[in-house]
From Swiss-Prot:
Residues passing through the membrane, by range: 43-63, 85-105, 114-134, 146-166, 177-197, 204-224, 250-270, 280-300, 316-336, 357-377, 382-402, 411-431, 444-464, 518-538
Keywords: Membrane, Transmembrane, Transmembrane helix, Transport
Extra information: The genes involved in HC-toxin biosynthesis, called collectively TOX2, are organized into a diffuse cluster that spans >500 kb. All of the known genes are duplicated or triplicated within this region, with some variation in copy number and chromosomal location among different race 1 strains.
Pfam entry (one): MFS_1
Basic and acidic residues composition-biased segments: 14-27
Protein name: MFS-type transporter TOXA
Coiled coil: none
CDD domains found in the cross-reference section: MFS_Azr1_MDR_like
Taxonomic source organism: Cochliobolus carbonum (Maize leaf spot fungus)
Metal-binding among keywords: no
PROSITE patterns on file: MFS (PS50850)
Cellular component per GO, a single term: plasma membrane
Length: 548
């Protein structure tokens, strides 16, 4: 491997990776084999930063849309008179963006990254337009699904484009900047959503995406001119039928369909239908069949699969997927239900609820900086995984103790602990997966952990909403004047219509319902301890793999 590294570095000069002459003979200078390393295009510094900043803006928009609805859920429940559908506003976006990422990983290897990225951005804008115009809950959910598909190709596309235009020795800084923008967007989404909704209306949370997306498209059209990729590894031109034939549509369809069935079953079971209802049972059965079929299909497809099953032989990679599954759900439980707690229990506005969550924002950003610097010197991941489990478990337990009379100091302190634990856990899942695999498989590492995070978020939100809905529906039995239709009108309506005594009962019930959501976070964070026996305490600094 050392010889390969030396050989590769000898072909790099002035930030441009040169191809051997034999690989460039009789080949159009603007067309490169997709699986070779193309020469980096010569672009000006202004063009480079314009492209990277536009990619960062697109990634920011995609991540922002993932959590911007968190603080809007009370308003949307009142607007659409549909409390039961609240979980789908966030879950369907995560479902579509997560399940399509492996497919987009293949697409970016086969088609022009410029036009595919712009297409994904247009799809995201189209979904935002549908949400902005929605007059009922089903239309809004469809818009979120469309936007999620577009978002699925934006982050992977941004990282792919950076690899095409940035020299290797500078690439980490640029990809880190895009990743940081995505992380910040995920956390401040509720704050921005609250500020926009309180001042100019919640629909502008989606209208505002359109001009930003148009500006990003214009910058890429003007500045970004990548080499075309229409040749096979042997240098023979490929037809579009051959390109399309290399894509695993069947696997993608089975994965998406299975997770949709699981999400519906978790959402409907115990609320809309009984768990023993034939529809719920059928959904669970179909999920099992599709999931097993998808697993077998991925094994059969080998290297052409969305996810090469050979990677599952890597212990460190499996552990990172498990951590991504646990900590992803832990983080989403708070991002979606803390704003609800602040608005329903504390009577905060949407902006106020977002501001109240700033301790979590600061904790996540702070722990990522500290952990990143420390790991760069020590190369040891295991201590931070242990710390993440401890802090996330303790923090989730402390959030579970939230009551209407909890002091502001404790609310802030508990969020700091929770944010540090969940933030460190998600970060270490990505770093661990990349450290566990060969450099050629790093794209699978990031995509796989992102998939686990998204799927964990989908399942967590569905389970939390199931528990939440069952708890608040009990108010119809305790308070004679409260019906399911009344509950669908939202928290503000309850504050204005119930007597002080009745409202006290309602507040306690809502507090218990949100505590149930935090209970899911406790279970997931504590479950991450099951991975401790498989941790590698060796330094990964300078190594290709974390596991032997």
């Amino acid at each position: 491997m050392d010889e390969q590294i030396v050989s590769a570095s000898s072909n790099v000069k002035d930030g441009v990776e040169k191809q051997p002459v034999k690989d460039r003979e009789d080949v159009d200078a603007n067309v490169v084999p997709p699986h070779s390393t193309p020469s980096l295009p010569k672009i000006s510094l202004i063009s480079l930063f314009s492209i990277v900043m536009s990619l960062g803006a697109a990634a920011f928009l995609g991540a922002l849309d993932a959590t911007v609805v968190a603080v809007l859920t009370p308003t949307l429940a009142q607007e659409f008179h549909s409390v039961d559908a609240v979980a789908w506003y966030g879950a369907i976006y995560l479902l579509m963006s997560g399940t399509t990422q492996p497919l987009f990983g293949k697409l970016y290897n086969e088609f022009s990254p410029k036009w595919l990225f712009i297409t994904c951005l247009i799809v995201l804008q189209l979904g935002s337009l549908v949400c902005a115009l929605a007059r009922n809950s089903p239309t809004f959910i469809v818009g979120r699904a469309v936007a999620g598909i577009g978002a699925g190709g934006i982050l992977s596309g941004a990282l792919n484009i950076v690899a095409l235009i940035v020299p290797l020795h500078h690439r980490a800084a640029f990809t880190g900047m895009i990743g940081a923008l995505e992380c910040v967007a995920l956390i401040i989404g509720p704050i921005i959503g609250g500020a926009i909704a309180d001042n100019i209306g919640w629909r502008w949370c989606f209208w505002i995406n359109l001009p930003i997306g148009a500006a990003v498209c214009a910058i890429l059209l003007f500045f970004f001119h990548p080499p075309r990729s229409t040749y096979s590894a042997s240098g023979v031109p490929r037809s579009y039928s051959e390109i399309l034939g290399n894509l695993d549509y069947i696997g993608a369809g089975m994965i998406i369909s299975s997770l949709v069935c699981l999400s519906l079953a978790l959402q409907w079971g115990g609320t809309k239908y009984k768990w023993g209802d034939g529809r719920v049972v059928a959904l669970l059965v179909v999920f099992g069949v599709l999931f097993l079929s998808a697993s077998g299909h991925q094994y059969w497809k080998g290297e052409k699969a969305l996810f090469p099953t050979r990677l599952l032989r890597q212990r460190g990679f499996l552990l990172s997927l498990f951590n991504g599954l646990c900590f992803g759900g832990v983080q989403y439980a708070a991002l979606y239900y803390l704003p609800t707690w602040f608005q329903a229990i504390k009577g905060e506005t949407r902006v106020g609820a977002g501001i109240q969550m700033l301790p979590i924002v600061g904790a996540i950003i702070g722990v990522n900086i500290v952990a990143g610097i420390t790991i760069s010197f020590t190369g040891r991941l295991a201590p931070f995984i242990v710390i993440a489990t401890v802090l996330a478990s303790v923090g989730s337990g402390l959030l579970y103790t939230f009551t209407p009379t909890k002091s502001q100091a404790r609310i802030i302190g508990y969020q700091l602990i929770y944010g540090a634990g969940s933030g460190a856990g998600v970060q270490q899942a990505f770093i661990g997966a990349q450290a566990a695999l060969d450099p050629a498989d790093v794209t699978y590492a990031s995509a796989s952990v992102l998939l686990m995070n998204s799927m964990s978020g989908v399942i967590t939100l569905c389970v939390c909403q199931n528990l939440f809905t069952n708890r608040i529906n009990a108010l119809t039995e305790v308070l004679p004047g409260v019906t399911k239709e009344t509950l669908q009108s939202g928290f503000a309506f309850l504050r204005s219509t119930l007597t002080p005594a009745e409202f006290g009962v309602a507040i306690q019930t809502f507090n218990s319902a949100i505590q149930d959501a935090f209970l899911v976070a406790i279970v997931l964070s504590c479950a991450s301890v099951l991975g401790w026996p498989f941790l590698s305490w060796a330094s990964v600094k300078g190594q290709k793999k974390m596991n032997k």
